[in-house]
Amino acid sequence: MSSLKKIPSPLVSLLPIVLLVGMLFATIHTFGSDALEGGSQISLLTTTAFCVFIGITFYRVPWKDYELAITNNISGVATAIIILLIIGALSGAWMISGIVPTLIYYGMQIIHPDFFLASTCIICALISVMTGSSWTTIATIGIALMGIGKAQGFNEGWIAGAIISGAYFGDKISPLSETTILASSITDVPLFRHIRYMLITTTPSLIITLIIFTVMGFVIETNSTAHMADFATSLKDTFTITLWLLIVPLVTGILIARKVPSIITLFISTMLAGICAIIFQPDLLREIAGENNIFKGVMMTFYGSTGLDTGNSMLTDLVSTRGMAGMMNTVWLILCAMCFGGAMTASGMLGSITSVFVRFMKGRVSVVASTVCSGLFLNLTTADQYISIILTGNMFRNIYEKKGYENRLLSRTTEDAVTVTSPLIPWNTCGMTQATILNVSTLTYLPYCFFNIISPLMSILVAAIGYKIVKRPVNNPE
């Protein structure tokens, strides 16, 4: 690519984004919850084509540049897509085998409704710290907590908000987290130094979040004890509830603790759940298969939609699963989002818009605020948190050094802006995935993800206060 290539102005660069927002708004307004069935994907592809048209026609950007950028983006999310498909099989297997119903049954007896939201946030935070993966946390214990919360009468938006807030706190500060490792490495900050520095903004954000969830736990009206008893009875009538089923979550936790790769861990957990389904729930498998064929029932649980008539409408909705096939709309959306991100990068539009943020970087607060806004913008346009972290780190590293700020300030701000906001964007890989796993739309849970909303604001507030932000001699190494 020629270095003399004309770069689109920021105003022109905004045109594809304006079109995307407009088309997504129209799609959601028209199709509602069915927008992911194809409307959102067509919106992304149409906007991608519009971006390519502008670049090729007016700025002479060769098609090969677009092809390369899009290919790189898609290859970068290949692992995430495989994980997503396995999670589809795992969620079905954990449900039909009775693992999730068992967790729900005993969880209802242990967790008091008044403290449910705060407890959910803390549980997900602890598990996510240990696993280093918000996706794994949400796909396993998150689904069980969703069931407990629904049984207790909580709105699904509140439950999902508590689950995601806790899971992304853990994902953010865990030394096992890919985003944490990526943010520290891209800014050349030692991992544990990066984590310690993040605690300055992350801890108060979590405390505020827990206060909100604790207060709302007492305010929100929940179901009566009799209603929950009926729900528990329906669980026992439908599934074989036994503590033996908890061996699978235990084995999964051991594999995670031993740092077995996510794909292998999730696959083993899925297979173990399938075996448990054969041992403990053979009648359910026959019901799913529609005939006396347990093997067919297991396979259908892994790959397709399953429905059981439990006699309790809430429980019937809860135990319905979609398997790997249920993830295909999300996979399709991810691929289309990667096309849009690649087109914006290859055309130079992404760089043109982010350069606007750089112009406002004067003092300490504006430096951090510009980084936060840029990171959030990249999450919106590239639709992938890993790409956003890499671009934010590379884009601002020299600027931070020239202005005398430590690299750890950049690494912390990058995570505050990118990692935690990714599940709040409907077309971002994280937003799409969590909405699919929890079966709650992104816009439904967004207002209740207090940790994710507060974190970037806390980053700017701490910068304004100036706590632990030290300017170094401009040309000295760290």
Question: Can you name each region flagged by the protein language model?
Answer:
Residues 1-84, 200-210, 214-333, 476-478:
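Hydrophobic transmembrane alpha-helices of multi-pass small-molecule transporters
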Residues 13-17, 116-119, 239-249, 366-369, ...:
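Short hydrophobic alpha-helical membrane-embedded segments
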Residues 14, 186-202, 206, 342, ...:
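C-terminal transmembrane helix pair
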Residues 20, 43, 47, 51, ...:
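Alpha-helical transmembrane segments in multi-pass membrane proteins
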Residues 59-150, 309-397:
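Membrane-embedded alpha-helical segments and adjacent helix-loop junctions characteristic
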Residues 83, 170, 174-182, 209-213, ...:
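Alpha-helical transmembrane segments and their lipid-water interface positions
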Residues 110-200, 204, 374-416, 477:
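Hydrophobic transmembrane alpha-helices that form the pore/transport pathway of multi-pass ion
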Residues 153-155, 257-263, 382-383, 440-441:
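Transmembrane helix interruption/hinge and helix-loop junction motifs
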